[in-house]
Amino acid sequence: MISSSRVAAMALRQSSRAIVPLAVLSSNGLRSRYFTPGLAHKTQIRTVTSDIAEIKQEIDKDESDNSAETTGVIDVKNQHEVVLYYDHIYFLGASSPAYFNVFLQFLRIRKQTPAQIRDKILKVSAPIPAEAEITQLIPFMRDCGAFAKFQVPPGVEVAEFVQQIRQNVVHNEKAYNSGIFRRVLSLFWSHYPAVYSVKGTPWIEDLRRYPNTKLKVKFEGEPLTEEELYVLFRRYGPLVDIIPGPESAEATLIYRGLRSAIAAKNCITGVSLNKGRTVLHLQYIPIKRVNYITEFVTNHQRIAIPIILALLATLAVLIFDPIRQYFIEVKITKRYSFDTYKDYAVVKTITKPLRVVHNWLSSSYDYIDKKIDSISSPGTASDEKSDDSDVSQALQTASTIWNERSEKSKQIKMWIYENVNTFIIVKGPKGSGKEEFILDHTLLNDEKLRHKILYINCSELAKARSDNDLLKSTANQLGYFPLFTWTNTVSQFVDLGVQGLTGQKSGLSESKETQLKNMFTLTSQAIRSIATRDYQKYHASVTRKNNRLPEGENIEILKEEEYLQQHPECKPIVVIDKFNRKADAASNDFVYPMIAEWSSVLVQNNLAHVIYVTSDVGSIQHLNNALPNQVFKSISLSDASSFSAKSFLMHQLKLEDDHTISGAFEPLGGRMLDLQAFVRRINSGETPPEALEEMVNQASEQVTTFFLCAHKIDDDTNWNAAQVWMLMKLLSKSDSINYSDLNKSPLFKPEEDTVATLTTLEKHDLISLQRDKGILDKISIGRPLFKAAFKQLISDPKISKLYEVDYISTLIKIENEKIKKFEGELISIQKLGDKLGSRVLYLSKKIDASNAKVVEYEGKIAEINSKPASKNFLKLF
C-alpha cells in the first residue's frame, strides 16, 4: 500500500519541478525541453535531446534534407513553436493485416495526401488563434497518427495555446457525435482524433515495432517509483498494471487500450526529469505471436487430430459432393452429349457438311479396296452383292429379329408407364441381345424415356482386381467425378500414424465397401434431384396461378409422391446390366447384394424405374433378399427363330440361297454367339459340315469336362454326374420334359434340393426352366447346340458305357440306403414285440421292392459291361 505521506511528497515534488514543454533550441544547441524554471541559471546537464542534436549536427553537415521524415527527429528552433500529436488520423495503421490493407487501398480509404491530413488536423482543431499555423507536419502512419508543429502567435503562452487546441478538439468531437448513430458507434469504437502535447523528444522511426498495450520504460539515470510513473502516464489513459523490471533501470506499463499506449509512447519518449538526472526511453514490447491452434494440436494430440480430420472430411464433403452430384446428373440426363442435340437445326447445319465429307472419304476408300480385290481376285466381284443390297438385307434381317420381340418391348414400356413399383427383370441366355433390346429398341427410341437413363455394367465392377480399380470402374459407371483414389493410401498411412501417436484409429481410412456405399448414396441424391426437378417447376407454376385466382378457387397442389405417380416419365430409369450371383473376384462378391439393396430403396421411395438385365438366374436371389415381399415383373428373351437365324447366316455369308448351309445350321438354333462362331469358321475356310462338327465336339467336351466331372469344381456345384446324364438322355429325345415326370426319379428327390440343382444347371446354361404362374412346369435345353452334343455323347459306346454305369450305380446306392434305413427301423420295432405287425409287413415289402431294383440294376450293369468297347470320338479312352 502506498502511504498518503508518500503520495503527498511525490505530488509536491512534481509541482515544484513545474514541467513546462518549451522545446527551446538556443544558439548553443538544443537544450532539454523539460526543465525547472528555478534551475535555469545552473549548469546545463547532459540530456538525450542535446546528444541527439549534437550527433545530428555532426552527421548532417553535408546533407541537404534534414527533415523529420529523414532523420526521425523534430527540430523546435524557438520558444514560440510547439509540437502536438494527433492520434487516429488514419483509418488503420501499417500494423493492420496485410490483406485488410489491400482491401482498404482498393476502397481508397487509406490513400490520404499530406494536404488532406493537414486539412483534417485544422478541421478537428478549429478555430485556431489568428497567426497560428502549422509549420511542419510529420505523418506517422504506423501508429495511425501525425505530429504537427505549430507556430504560436506572439503574446500567447504555449500552455494557453495547447489548452485552447485541446478544448477545440473536445468541442468538435461532441459536435461530431451529436447524431444518434455516431453516438452509439462511439460507445464501441471511438475513432475521432485526440490531441496530446509532446513532452519529450519523439523518435519517428519506421522499424517493425508495432503498437502494443505494453510499454517498456528504460531509465537513463535515476529510476522513477511506481507512483511517479503512474502520475506521469495516467493522463494518456487507464493503466492496468505497472510492473518493475528485474533490474531497476526499467519498468513495464500495461495500458487498457492500444490508443493510450500509442499516445504515451509518442509523447513521453525522451523526456528529462529530476533536474536532468533521469531520462525516459519508451518502446513497444513486441507482441508474442502465439498460434493457439498449433499449441492446441501439439499439447492435445488425441483430441486435436480427430477434430482436424473430421473438419477436413466435412470440408471435403461440402466442397466436392455438390460437384460430384452435378456430374452424376449430367451422366444421367446426358446434358452435354452430342446425341441430345443432334436433331437441333443449328447442329444439323454444322454437322451436315462434315458428314458429306466423311461419306466421300469412305466411298473413296471402299472404291479403292474393291478395285484392288477385283485385280487380285478376278471374277469374284460379279458374285458379290452391291452395297445397297447388303444394307437393305441387313436392315431386313435386323427388323425380322426385333419384330419378334416388339410385343415384349411394348410390355416393358407399359409397365414403366403404369408406374407401380417398376422393378423389371429381363432374363435370357448370353448372346440373346438383351442389352440391345432394352436400350436401343425399348428406351432410346421412346421420346419421353430416352433422356433420363443411367446404365450400369456390373461386369466392369465385378472384374476389378484392386480397390482402386473397383472405385474407378464404379465412378466411371455412375459419372462420379472427381475421384481421388490416392487418398486411400494416404489415409491408411495417416491412420497408422495417428494410431501410433494417440493409441486409437482416426477413422479416416474407409473400406471399399463404405466408399462404394457413399458413391451410390450420392447417386441416389442425384436421382432424387432429377426426379423432383419437374415437380418443383409444377409447384411454382401452380403457386403463381393460385396467387392470381380468387380465394376459394385455388388449384390443389399435388404432393411429391402423387406427382411422381402421375408422371412416370419424370423418374430416371436405372438399367443394371450383367447382374450375376457371384463376381469374378471373390473380394467383390459384396457388389451385387449392395446394388440390389440400393436399387430396392430407389423403387420403394418411388424415385426411379429399375430394370435388371441378367443371364444368371441365381442372381435373382439377391433381389429376393432386398425386396422379400415384392413380385417382380419378368421378361424372358429366347433365342432367335429358325427363319431369323437362317436370314442372319445368309446375310453374313452373302449367300443367295440356303442350299449351302441347309442341314448345318439347325443344330445351332437361334443362339447368336453360336451363329457368329459358325460364320467365323466358314470365313476361315471350313465347310459348313466341318464347322458344325467342330462346334459340336467343343460343346461335348464342355459337357464332359464341366457337368459330368466326378470331382466338385466349386461350392456352386450341387449336382452329380448321374443327374446330368439322366437329363441328357431325356432331352436328347425330346425338346422339353415335364418337371412332374422328372420329379418321379429317385435322383431328383427331395423337391427342395431338386429345384436348387436345376436352378444351378440353368445358371450354367445347360437347361432352361419354364414356369407357369410362378410354378416350375417344363425343362428344356439351355443352349441349342447342347442337344447335338447330348446325342453325340449318348451315341458313343465308350462314353455311354462309362456314365450309364455311374448312373445305375447311383440308383443302386440310393436303394441300398433305403434298405439300410428300413432295416434300422425293423430292428427298433422288434424291441416292441408283436404290437406293430402291420408296420413290419410294410417295411418288409419295401425292402423286397428295393432289393428287387438292386438286382435289376446290377443285371443292367452286367449287360453293359458285356458289350465290346469301341474307340470314342474324343479319343480319350
From Swiss-Prot:
Q: Which residues cross the membrane?
A: 303-323
Any single Gene Ontology cellular-component annotation:
mitochondrial inner membrane
RRM domain ranges (all copies): 213-286
Q: Which residues lie on this side of the membrane: Mitochondrial intermembrane?
A: 324-877
SUPFAM superfamilies registered for this protein in UniProt: P-loop containing nucleoside triphosphate hydrolases
List the InterPro entries. Mt_escape_2_C (IPR018850), P-loop_NTPase (IPR027417), Yme2_C (IPR039627), Yme2_RRM (IPR034260)
Cellular compartment(s): Mitochondrion inner membrane
Q: Which UniProt keywords apply?
A: Membrane, Mitochondrion, Mitochondrion inner membrane, mRNA processing, RNA-binding, Transit peptide, Transmembrane, Transmembrane helix
The yes or no answer to whether the keyword Membrane is present is: yes
The record gives the membrane topology as: Single-pass membrane protein
An MF annotation (GO) of this entry? RNA binding
Q: Which GO terms describe its biological process?
A: mitochondrial genome maintenance; mRNA processing
Q: Where is the signal peptide?
A: none
List the stretches on the Mitochondrial matrix face of the membrane. Answer: 48-302
Superkingdom as given in the UniProt entry: Eukaryota
Gene3D superfamilies in the record, alphabetically?
A: P-loop containing nucleotide triphosphate hydrolases
The residues forming the transit peptide are 1-47
Instruction: Please tell me whether the keyword Transit peptide is annotated for this protein.
Output: yes
Similarity-based family: Belongs to the YME2 family.
Role: Plays a role in maintaining the mitochondrial genome and in controlling the mtDNA escape. Involved in the regulation of mtDNA nucleotide structure and number. May have a dispensable role in early maturation of pre-rRNA.
User: What is the protein name stated in its UniProt record?
Assistant: Mitochondrial escape protein 2
The protein's organism comes out as Scheffersomyces stipitis (strain ATCC 58785 / CBS 6054 / NBRC 10063 / NRRL Y-11545)
